[in-house]
Each structure stands twice: as C-alpha cells, then as structure tokens.
Amino acid sequence: MTDFLPTGIELSYLVAASLFILGLKQLGSPATARQGNSLAAVGMLLAVVATLLDQQVLNYQMIFVGLLIGSIIGAIAAYKVEMTDMPQMVGLLNGLGGAASALVAIGEFWRLIGTGEPVTLADTITIILGVLIGGVTLTGSFVAFAKLQGLLPGAPMTFPLQQPVNALILIGFFVASGYLILTPTNLTVFLGLVAISLVLGVLFVLPIGGGDMPVVISLLNSYSGLAASAAGFVVMNNMLIIAGALVGASGIILTQIMCKAMNRSLTSVLFGAFGGSSKPGTAGATGSGSQDKTYKSVDAEEAAMMLGYARSVVIIPGYGMAVAQAQHSVRELADQLEGKGVEVKYAIHPVAGRMPGHMNVLLAEANVPYPQLYDMDDINPQFDETDVALVIGANDVVNPAARTDAASPIYGMPILEVDRAKHAIVIKRGMSTGFAGVDNDLFYKDKTMMLFGSAKEIVAQLVSQVKQL
C-alpha cells in the first residue's frame, strides 16, 4: 500500500489535469460552460483528495479547519454575490490565489532557514518568482476590485515620473533578488522583496482605466495561474505546476484576444493610461465640437412602437445594463417582442463590461437562450438587414469613429456596426462619453434616437408599452 501511494497520487493528478483540460475546452462555449465548470470542479476535488493522502502532510487538523472556513466563505459568497458583481468577485479570487502562492513561497523560505538545510539556487529562484508573481497578483487584484467597486476612481490614476519610478522599483527588486541569491538566508532582504512585490502590484493597476478592466482581470487571472505554477515548483507538486500553467496560458491567450478586439497592444493597456481625460483640441475629444451637434430623443412609448412593429431587432448590451441590473427586464422585453413575431438577437462585443464574458454571464443568468447570442464577427454582416438596433448602456464598442475617424484614439478598434442598422435606439443616462473619453458619432446620426434614463427603468417602461400594442 505504501509503495502504491505515490504512484496513485501521481495518477490522480494526471486524471485531474485531464479534467481541467476538458473543462477549459467546454468553457469555450456558452452551451457547455456549466458542464465544463463541473468537470473542472471534480478535477480540483480529486487533486485535493490525492494531495491529502500524501505522507508529507503533517497536520490534518489545520488543513481541515482551513478547508471548512474556506468552504463556508465560498458558499456564502456564491449565494450572496449578485451576478452583476462578478467582476469584483473574480478580482478578489485572483488576488486570493496570488496571496496563497506568495504565502507558500514565504512558508518554504521560513522552513529552509529554520531547519538549517542548504538553500540551492533553484530553491531561491523559485521562491523569488513565487513572491513576485503572487505579491503583484494580490495587490493588483485588490486595486482592480477597488476600482470596479467604486472605492477608487475608475479613471487612470497617474503621478509625475510614474514610469521612471516604476522602473527604479523594478530594478531595486532585481538587485535585491541578486543579493538574496548570494546570501539565500538573509531575512531582511527577503522581506524587502515581499514588500516591493506588493508595491509593484499597486503601481501596476493604478494607471489603468476602467475601460481596460476586462483586459486587466484576464491578465491578473493569468498571473494567478503563473503564481500557482511557481508555488508548485517551490513545493515540488506536479498538480500545482500543471494547473497553474493551464490557467496562466489560457489567461494570456484570452488577454491577447481581448487586446486584439480593442485594437490595442498589451503594453498600451498597461502603460497608456487609456481612458484618461482627453487633451483639449484633440480629435474626438469632448468639448465645444460636441455641443454644436444635435441629437434626436424619443420617449418609451415611441420607442416601444418602433420595436413592436419591427421585423428584426438586435439588442446590444453594455456596462450600463450591468450597472442597472437590467438583464431580467431585457429578457422580458425580448419575450414580449418575440410574442409579436419580432426576431430578436443579442450582439456581444468581446470587451463589453468589466470582465471577459461579462455580458454572456449576465444574459445567461437571465436565461437568455444561447442561440440568440451572436459574436461581433457573426452579427456585423446582419446589421444591414436589421430594422432596429437597441443599444443598452454600451458606448465605445458601438462608436463608428473607430471605423471612420483616423484621428480618434479608438480608430481601428473592431466595433459592433450599429450605425448600419435601419434605426438605432440608445438607452443612456446622458450624453457623457465612454471610458475612451471620446464623443460617440452614433448618437448624432439621423437614424439614431436617444432614450434617456436608467436602463432598468427604461426597459421596464418599454415592456409595459409593448404589451399595450
């Protein structure tokens, strides 16, 4: 039995890794996402049970206390947290994953200097990487959470000489790392590395605007995976290495996909302070130019008539729908329209909202049928034949300036081509700009009608008016 145990544990890890891969594959489609999530959860349970059978485990009581506390907190969070708060939840979970990895590295360092065992170069490097990636993920995710929750301003937060200061701090980390490699039991230097890692995480996310939060959340998710993988090397656990590598790789791929959807490089997201206030006189900036433009507005009754007597309607959800928690009202409106013979579709932009798949998650929670959800590339050719495009709280992702104005900061960004529809109704609180800080040309087109108010209240009014048609 004793001889079989190590082999059995490794085989369990192999099965768990296979379940993770299958789960990731099924998470790629809304129709199979729930099943994929369940497969990944079973894989994680198997990995945890196998690890608990390891003979190196010294204190089961502490482990089970931790599991109990964590499970209770997780269950309460899953029950209490609204779907509209999922970006904040994901940010916190990323941060906790980074914290766990950093604590593993810190614990291993403490063990090595406490037992007097010789510290190898490989030990030191893996511990440094675990502390760096884990620390950056922890504080970076908490800053992202604070921005999403409104505890910190969503706009980029910058200060003079910010990039040189960041560079100096990073150089300081590398210098201290080199010194720790030469003196691997130096506690003062090690604690300094921990502190620098935490500071770097804060400085990394502060200058990033709210419009880039989907990319940041995805990148931090990747970091949490890399941190777990580094922790796996620290404690020589193959399952941690594999699982962390899967999360890290998938997160990086998703980050690149989202950057492509915004027509921006990752470096411009991290260092460009996108979404800050526009300079006066720059193309696309708000100012006197936008004040000279005119727009048309409608009330809920007129908008309901346009929707109710249309043959085809495409709904474009955005962050405004998430903030107003209007997804259930939107589903009810779609049901009413379909009952009158209107064909209803949903157009999803990859970076709409505040996390990857934000709109998909909200619409799934409202039980919107998966076949009605269309990606940007699939729906854009259909706008020419669409009678009414209903924009709910989306801004930059439907701005035609991205296609027509070479001077605009969002020029080249793939958008949902709502301006090609026969008519457009835009539900919005006011005429303010999106996170890119540029005016939206769509709002001033002859075919566009502005319907002002909170998304949830306005959609509820539309439902009531459509019922009366």
Name the predicted role of every residue range.
Residues 246-310:
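Membrane-interfacial segments at transmembrane helix termini in multi-pass membrane proteins
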Residues 18-32, 71-90, 141-156, 200-213, ...:
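C-terminal ends of transmembrane helices
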